[in-house]
From Swiss-Prot:
EC number: 4.2.1.9
Record PROSITE patterns: ILVD_EDD_1
Pfam family of the protein (one): ILVD_EDD_N
Protein name: Dihydroxy-acid dehydratase
Active site: S474
Reactions mediated catalytically: (2R)-2,3-dihydroxy-3-methylbutanoate = 3-methyl-2-oxobutanoate + H2O; (2R,3R)-2,3-dihydroxy-3-methylpentanoate = (S)-3-methyl-2-oxopentanoate + H2O
Species per Swiss-Prot/TrEMBL record: Anaeromyxobacter sp. (strain Fw109-5)
Function according to Swiss-Prot or TrEMBL: Functions in the biosynthesis of branched-chain amino acids. Catalyzes the dehydration of (2R,3R)-2,3-dihydroxy-3-methylpentanoate (2,3-dihydroxy-3-methylvalerate) into 2-oxo-3-methylpentanoate (2-oxo-3-methylvalerate) and of (2R)-2,3-dihydroxy-3-methylbutanoate (2,3-dihydroxyisovalerate) into 2-oxo-3-methylbutanoate (2-oxoisovalerate), the penultimate precursor to L-isoleucine and L-valine, respectively.
Keyword Iron-sulfur applies: yes
Cofactor(s) listed in the protein's UniProt record: [2Fe-2S] cluster; Mg(2+)
SUPFAM superfamilies: IlvD/EDD N-terminal domain-like, LeuD/IlvD-like
Length: 561
């Protein structure tokens, strides 16, 4: 039986195509082998990606040994930490769409038979998965792996969150320049995705839970022999399943796989960005999946692992040592029906077979169900008159005293205004900070709010101030921070109608985000209201703002106008 790449290499009419392929070094024998795409994301400026060029070389060698013909291509990548707190963050979420489009373009333009994806950080992982789902060929993911936690001289573990929060302490005069410099130099000690349960590691963990990656993908450290061995196995597996209809990506990433991903997300208190990305991934997979389904999963899954930033002493390397994703899945599967164990993985095993025999090796890192941090998941979906279409909060990172909090609104119409206000002392205990016009359309690009949230924590206001935004948060954010408020202010959402001094309430147990203003008053405020429009000079961001949906739909690009 033929394979997809026969379209470009078989028959007399493809002589010109073969001629071009021979120019790249192919021989007669290669035209009888499967053509394997390698979507690499080597980018020098990203700590999790600067070494991926070597990983691509290793993967190509392994594919050749396994009987395939590798064709490597690259995607762009944005480092959210470096783009944070300035106009660069406008491009982070839109880059997900460019990455997805580039995967679809390269794979379909050249009729490749299978795909090996080598992502690592932030938007690159979901962007690759979205594009691969459109192509729907057998696909294996192997990320670059997480970095080690940093260590202070006394052995205290630190990470990127420590550095961001230290800025707030320095602004208050609670930390010297020398102390800040020591943290700066030690927070990110190696290559890899940042060491906590931030967005990159969350998405790599979820790829493992969905079965598109091999066991260990989410937790084995970067730049180690273990990670290299994992990459070699993934490359070989891409050749083994090339052309095998059973392993087409949409047969792996189905409703059961997406459910299992959210189970692990809830059990480990992943980044709130995972909600945005899983909604988009489900759409590309053709799976009906929304915020209500996510909340239903959260209600059934205990939160059994707290990882930085929720618990600063525990990092991804500790989760790996404690048994990794298989141990987490095995533990939550003890509550019957929670894990869909019949779901197929790229190795040919079911999830149930993959986790059989897994065990928790350190119960201080992964708790048994009986000692869960909470009986429900580490993420929650909120609704209410301030978020009729939903909002998301990382409950794993909220202090107990802030799970129900009412504060007086102090409103900012951009992240930059908010940072200036916080640094300038405008935000006081008892305030509920509202940052609006930062949604997918209004930003545009739905900036991450790590800078303002870190300033709030670093200034010691974490148990006295809450924050709500139509933007989103870094996985490194902690505190009573509600994001993805939908509809966003730029499309006339209620967030745009809030005024300074209004009483705003977050109630995690009630799953509610509300403003204590009568409906009649909100209606009066809406009369004559026009959302603010920011001047957008970039042609790409203009197109993005015109076509993007709001966060409740995954901030995907609309294809029907």
């Amino acid at each position: 039986m033929g394979v997809r790449s026969d379209t470009i290499k078989k028959g007399f009419e493809r002589a010109p195509h073969r001629s071009l392929l021979r120019a790249t070094g192919l021989t007669d024998a290669d035209f009888d082998k499967p053509f394997i795409g390698i979507a690499n994301s080597h980018v020098d400026i990203i700590p999790g990606h600067f070494f991926l060029q070597e990983y691509g070389r290793i993967a190509k060698d392994e594919i050749r040994k396994a009987g395939g013909v590798p064709f490597e291509f690259n995607t762009i990548g944005v480092d959210d930490g470096i783009a944070m707190g300035h106009a660069g963050m406008l491009y982070s979420l839109p880059s997900r769409e460019l990455i997805a489009d580039s995967i679809e373009t390269m794979m379909n333009a050249h009729s490749l038979d299978a795909l090996l994806c080598i992502p690592n950080c932030d938007k690159i992982v979901p962007g690759m998965l979205m594009g691969a789902l459109r192509v729907d060929v057998p696909t294996v993911f192997c990320s670059g792996g997480p970095m080690k936690a940093g260590r202070m001289a006394d052995g205290t573990a630190i990470d990127l969150t420590t550095a961001f929060e230290a800025v707030g302490k320095r602004a208050l005069g609670q930390m010297s320049d020398a102390e800040l410099y020591e943290i700066e130099c030690k927070a990110c000690p190696s290559g890899g995705s940042c060491s906590g349960m931030f967005t990159a590691n969350s998405m790599n963990v979820l790829c493992e839970a969905m079965g598109v990656a091999l066991p260990g993908n989410g937790t084995a450290l970067a730049l180690t022999p273990e990670r290299e061995a994992l990459l070699r196995r993934a490359a070989r597996r891409a050749v083994e399943i090339a052309g095998d209809e059973r392993f087409r990506l949409r047969r792996i990433v189905n409703a059961d796989a997406i459910h299992n991903a959210m189970v692990v997300d809830m059990a480990m208190g992943g980044s709130s960005n995972t909600v945005l990305h899983m909604l988009a991934i489900a759409r590309e997979a053709g799976v009906e999946f929304g915020l209500r389904q996510i909340e239903a999963v959260a209600a059934k899954v205990g939160h059994i692992a707290k990882i930085a930033p929720s618990l600063s002493t525990v990092h991804i390397e500790d989760v790996h040592r404690a048994g990794g994703v298989p141990a987490v899945l095995h533990e939550v599967a003890r509550r019957g029906g929670v894990v869909r164990e019949d779901a197929l993985t790229v190795t040919g095993e079911t999830v149930g077979e993959r986790i059989r025999g897994a065990e928790i090796k350190d119960r201080s890192v992964i708790h048994p169900l009986e000692e869960a941090y909470s009986a429900v998941g580490g993420l929650a979906v909120l609704f209410g008159n301030l978020a009729p279409e939903g909002a998301v909060v990382k409950t794993a990172g909220i202090q107990p005293s802030m799970r129900k909090f009412t504060g007086r609104a102090i409103c900012f119409d951009s992240q930059e205004e908010a940072i200036a206000g916080i640094m300038g002392g405008k935000v006081k205990p008892g305030h509920f900070v509202v940052i609006r016009y930062e949604g997918p359309r209004g930003g545009p690009g739905m900036q991450e709010m790590l800078a303002p949230t870190s300033l709030i924590m670093g200034m010691g206001l974490g148990e006295q101030v809450a924050l709500a935004t139509d933007g989103r948060f870094s996985g490194a954010t902690r505190g009573a921070c509600v994001g993805h408020v939908s509809p966003e202010a730029a499309e006339g959402g209620p967030l745009a109608l809030v005024q300074d001094g209004d009483a705003v309430t977050i109630d995690v147990e009630a799953r509610a985000l509300t403003v204590d203003v009568p409906d009649a008053e909100l209606a009066r405020r809406r009369e004559g209201f026009r959302p603010k429009r920011k001047e957008i000079r970039s042609s790409w961001l203009k197109r993005y703002a015109l076509l993007v949906s709001n966060a409740s739909a995954g901030a995907v690009m609309k294809t029907e106008l």
